[in-house]
Amino acid sequence: MLPTFLIVTQGMQHKGPALLALISLLSSLIVLYLSLPILLPSTMPCKSVSAVCLAAVSMVAAQCNNTMPAAADLGWHAPNMTAINNLTAVVNGTGVLGFIFNTSATPATSSYSTYNWCNMPHVRAQEYVSVSKDYQLKYVEVIHRHHKRTPYASNTFPHETYSWSCDDEALFYYGTPIPDGTAAQINWKVFNSPANPFAPAGFNGTCQFPQITGQGLNDSRQHGKDLYGVYYGLLKFLPTEYDSSKVKYRVTNNVITSQVAGEVVEGMYLSTTNNPTQVLIQPASIDSLEPAYTCSAASAQYSSYGVSSKAANWTAHLNASASLFAKLDSVSGVNASDSGWHNWFDHYFDNLSARLCHSKALPCSSSNSSNCITYTDAEAVFRRGEYEYSFIYRDSPASLAASTGAFGVYMSELAANLRGVMNGSDPVIYRHNIAHDGSISRLLSILQLDVMVWPGMGSEVVFELYEKSQCWYIRVLWGGQVMRSSNPYLGRMDLVPVSNLLAYIDALVGVNGVKVPRLCSAS
């Protein structure tokens, strides 16, 4: 609501011009003062409220109409209703909306923007839409899921009927003392000893479960090439050669993100081939990117309405899938009482999609080779998995609060990075974060994506910060296209005032994440 003195001015057009000008000036100054908590951190290099700082803010406010956003809308806004989150379509439907689950290469008959679980669409030159030349790109932050991998050991069947070989790649693990050390390039080779009487869980063969596969490493390298093709090739924004003072890469404590990083970095900068390249990583107990810091309140919220909950709107799809579970269990050998496999479809989804992405046969029973999971069965699993992620991270009204606690620290880091560029204190122009589906899902949840999906392999969100006439704007790309938020305060995130995004993040988690510890400890 506008202050009374602002409303009064609308009816005083007939009064003396001097009086009207004075009232208008006072109105502007008061609105500016009320906006200072948002303006100071987001637009100016001010460390404290001083006369000089106020003058600088006044100047910017006069130049930009985007520095005084309305109060951020912190409400949860429902995603669009589609076949993804329609329970009837999920249970009784066929196919998976044209989504791809069996190749990294999206067929020429499909648009590149088509959902491809094995290798999701990302920014690349062929589809990239440049903004007007009036806008100058100042900063880019990329966050994406790792690329395709073997399934987690916990998601393999008690007895797999064929082996899985990873002899087409090498995974290196070694250390080097600094500054005067060297090392042999040590890589792991999985083997089975005839003198070891125990059989490995899941697949026999030469893979770790999980590890990024050889195909996944190739996808990772191409991802790096595609990003460089846009941000250097098209826009001449990135440095020609790798410069660690301007370009930063970050991984989580899960080694599969480092496996991806090795190829992404080389795909962007060939000079890094076989050369030491530093990536950033936070301590395992407080890693905000994975995320791995303890947030008991968020965990309690998720379990109150999602996986393991007894909430009717969660269990409805599980109860309607009893016959599907029975078929899957008869092939896999998983016990019907195993809650990990039956309180959601995550385990079956990971197992079956990993096979298909690597051109492996869908499984048959170890005791009856004619009893097999069909592609129709797999599609039924995939529909339910997509439904679950939409429900957990968007459809439930509790999802915004849960995701804010669980991923709020990364959001505060993103805001700090944007401010550092805007106020001139941070020389880094490009940050690249390699994360997980849980990271991307929570980010999309907080930004309130209008159509939620399970983020597939390589799923990518890009934040582009632009300046025009000393005003700052943000463009957010999801899968290479402008993101649409169900929250009208964010809306279509195409060159919106960055002050809107910063105000939204600040209101949720506080500057530098100061609200997150309290959010995570709330009962």
Language-model region placement:
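Sec-dependent N-terminal signal peptides
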Residues: 20-21, 25, 50-52
